[in-house]
């Protein structure tokens, strides 16, 4: 079924006129399930179809950054398919999604939890420095202005609970902010805001 859907999408794009406007690849969250984005992106690339814009949230922002940077998707597939974050954390897809939403709603109301995530109390299990190092390597430490394909990441403002679109500055910071799972990864301070996983407010971003 997925193969038929991808095939139909490719045929539809091939048949569109040159003045169709911009084509956007929108990648949502979903933890380990987000790895499927890599396969779709690779199929589109193999078909010679490149989006004008890539938008991602949570795991989708990680894959989206790679697509926008024209990274080696085959190499990423080999690395990421060996990892299953949800399995390691013993959290099902449904539970993780509900947990993110519940924690996210709580975070924007409870100042004490915000203090904890700022690092004023116990540290979350994932160190931000390690995440930054990984995303720096993955994105070649690129700035948004250096990307060959236009890209935007979606994050959540910890203070207000509102959606934040990031499309300037360093790509690794935006990707880290968009995928900062509440309670597991510290929020990312960017442009004066504390940002967490974009999936809290928008699982599939539409700009």
Per-segment meaning from a language model:
Residues 1-57, 65-207:
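Patatin-like phospholipase
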């Amino acid at each position: 079924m997925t193969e038929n859907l991808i095939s139909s999408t490719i045929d539809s794009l091939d048949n569109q006129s040159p003045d169709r406007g911009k084509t956007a690849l929108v990648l949502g969250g979903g933890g380990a399930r987000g790895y499927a984005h890599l396969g779709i992106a690779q199929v589109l690339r193999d078909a010679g179809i490149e989006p004008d814009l890539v938008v991602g949230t949570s795991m989708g922002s990680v894959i989206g950054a790679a697509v926008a940077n024209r990274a080696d998707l085959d190499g990423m597939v080999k690395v990421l398919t060996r990892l299953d974050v949800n399995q390691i954390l013993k959290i099902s897809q449904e539970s993780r999604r509900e947990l993110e939403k519940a924690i996210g709603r709580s975070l924007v109301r409870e100042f004490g939890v915000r203090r904890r995530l700022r690092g004023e109390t116990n540290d979350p299990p994932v160190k931000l420095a390690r995440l930054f190092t990984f995303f720096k390597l993955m994105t070649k430490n690129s700035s948004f202005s250096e990307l060959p394909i236009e890209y935007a990441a979606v994050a959540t403002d910890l203070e207000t609970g509102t959606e934040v679109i990031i499309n300037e500055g360093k790509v690794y910071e935006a990707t880290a902010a968009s995928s900062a799972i509440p309670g597991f990864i510290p929020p990312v301070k960017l442009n004066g805001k504390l940002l967490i996983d974009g999936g809290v407010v928008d699982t599939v971003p539409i700009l």
